[in-house]
Amino acid sequence: MSQRIYIALPSGYTRETAYAAEDALTLLGYEPANSADNNGDDRANLRMLTQCDGVLLAPNWETNPMSALAATVAQHLNIPVGSYDHWSAHPVEEGQ
């Protein structure tokens, strides 16, 4: 079973950017959980985050209150948080 990674995107990111992040995580062997799929529903985003094994923070995440909240909640729940560089340094190996 692959690790599920929540994609925390600041407002202003396009759907194309959101799905590019999703594709990148998939290529690394992760199962992406894309906050863009929730159409701005912050409660749905937080529910999605709590069901994940990690959080991908997009560039400039700290400028967006919801992305900052996602990082704080994840850290409180001991869910690993990192940039693309972090997750790409730890790709999922086959069979995980």
Where are these regions (language model features)?
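Conserved catalytic or regulatory cores that recognize and/or transform ribose-phosphate-containing ligands
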Residues: 1-96
